[in-house]
Amino acid sequence: MDKENKMDILNNQIFLLLLITLIGMTIGKINIKNFSLDSSAIIFVGLFFGHFGYTLPKTFQTLGLVLFIYSIGLQAGPGFFFSLRQRGLKLSLGTVAIIGIGFLTTLATTYLFHFSAGTSAGIFTGALTSTPGLAVAVEIAGGQNAPAAYGVTYFFGIVGVIVFIQIIPKILNITVKDEEQALNKERDKTHKPLHFMHLELTNLNLVDRQVKHLNLKSISPVIITRLLRKNGTEPILVGGQTILQAGDHLRITGTKDDLEMMQMYLGTPVDQDIEFERVLSGEYITVSNKDICGMSLKQLNCHEVFNVQLSRISRNGIELPAGPNLRLHMGDTIHAVGSKQSLENIKKIFGNSIKDSYNFNILPIFTGLFLGFILGKIPLYIPFSGIFYLGTTGGVLIAGLFLSNIYKTGPLIWAIPSNANSFIREMGLVLFMATIGTQTGTSILATLRHEGLQLSLAGILVTTVPLISSVFICKHLLKLPFLSMLGVITGAMTSTPGLATMAKISKTPYATSSYATVYPVALISMIIYTKLLIFIVERFF
């Protein structure tokens, strides 16, 4: 193949897309001391090819943008609304405030260096390492300024968080082990560890009464899980309809104080442990039956109907208690306890097919995209500013957020399995990053020659000012524990390398759980702040 033919093949758009993706993904996998570019390497490879005149069509960019943002909405939906309630509210406020500091710092650098709206948005999203924010910037501001600025400032965002996480314990004179022990003690106060004990029923006033009529919760929040009849050989799973008999051996779960109180109410402890596992067994069952997806455990009433007790549910790697109001999702893994025959019966209801749990219907995805597109075209009036449109990104994002939270409408299951969502997100990201890289590459050197120093300085400021401010916000205003503060900071910066660094500092789940709580809020906040940034710069700067 001569040189001319080699150049001709680079003009083939499919070949160019595949080549940029392969090189970019390969470079992105290179990890040096927790630093890696991941999928963002694609945009840098695209810049290289774009500089030499090889570009991809904008239709690739638009398609990738829509797929990527919609998948973000589907992923973040349930977690986003959950984070706005209870414990997550304080963490979410910290996240919004940290990103807000980055937003204000970007406005200051824009005023100082006279950046355009696109460049300003690129600095903001690059310094805070937000690809969804960049996607919004490209759609609204257009042109090549945003991706070029993103490419320059992204490096500072990645390195800045890693260095900050490593040095902040020393600056604040924090001993991580002491912080872990303090949080463990606090956890034990609010969430006392559960124990179990075995009692023989000696209170004759409770004989021949159903468990649901004992009003146990009004006395002490314990649960009678299983019993063994006097002289019996087979254990029984206890439910509300179970009738107690004199001499029953009961297995009760609760805190130590609650269990001691139950001794006065129910009976005397049994010294010899009762071997309940002789007949009963536990299995993990996969939800793959779409007909029960969206139903609550209370609706299924597994204990009364199938004589099976559900203890916990694993969803996307997270363990959830099997509460009565918990709704089942496709792909959930349920830990169930019962007899072999009962477990076989309930498997037929849940499906228990890993292969089927990976299946998904393409119709809800395109329906959601269509609804999002329509939503983005609806004119909204903002006082003193005129007509405002959500745009394609805003429309599909809101559609994804709400539809995934609804989960199911009739036969349509809006949420999709995590593996399918990851595929759609990565495919959209590849199309978007590769295209925007090649489009920007044609003018990247001119941008660097003209504004390279200003962009670098702005990137450093927009990364470091929010990080430094985060200590005051989280530690002094919100009174967050140190490890929770680390989770909020890395979550607000949407920094996966920062998360890896944080995990090395502390093996406990406190920091990572805070990260998981605020991450959906950070994704949505970055998109909203980016829209607002462009709006302000275009009209007032």
Swiss-Prot record:
Database matches in Pfam families: Asp-Al_Ex, TrkA_C
TM regions (residue ranges): 10-32, 39-57, 62-84, 91-113, 146-168, 357-375, 385-407, 428-447, 452-474, 481-500, 515-537
Every RCK C-terminal domain range: 183-260, 268-352
Gene Ontology biological-process annotations: potassium ion transport
Gene3D superfamilies in the cross-refs: Regulator of K+ conductance, C-terminal domain
Family under the similarity heading: Belongs to the AAE transporter (TC 2.A.81) family.
Name of the protein this chain belongs to: Uncharacterized transporter DP0976
Organism encoding this protein: Desulfotalea psychrophila (strain LSv54 / DSM 12343)
